[in-house]
């Protein structure tokens, strides 16, 4: 049975209007060990 990877995306700091922030993305539960991940703005 194959399961999709687990993906978690969250900001490093609480959001503030007009201020930039960084997003952290953690992906686990996939094989092979090296994959390419693209973040797209929706």
Curated annotation (Swiss-Prot):
UniProt cross-references to SUPFAM superfamilies, sorted A to Z: Immunoglobulin (SSF48726)
- Could you provide one GO biological process annotation from this protein's UniProt record? antigen processing and presentation of peptide antigen via MHC class I
- InterPro entries named in the record: Ig-like_dom_sf, Ig-like_fold, Ig_C1-set
One Pfam match: C1-set
Q: What does this protein do?
A: Component of the class I major histocompatibility complex (MHC). Involved in the presentation of peptide antigens to the immune system.
How this chain assembles, per its entry, is:
Heterodimer of an alpha chain and a beta chain. Beta-2-microglobulin is the beta-chain of major histocompatibility complex class I molecules.
Its recorded name reads: Beta-2-microglobulin
Gene symbol of the encoding locus:
B2M
């Amino acid at each position: 049975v194959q399961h999709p990877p687990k993906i978690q995306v969250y900001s490093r700091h609480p959001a503030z209007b007009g201020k930039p922030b960084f997003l952290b993305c953690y992906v686990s539960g996939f094989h092979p060990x090296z994959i390419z991940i693209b973040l797209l703005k929706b």
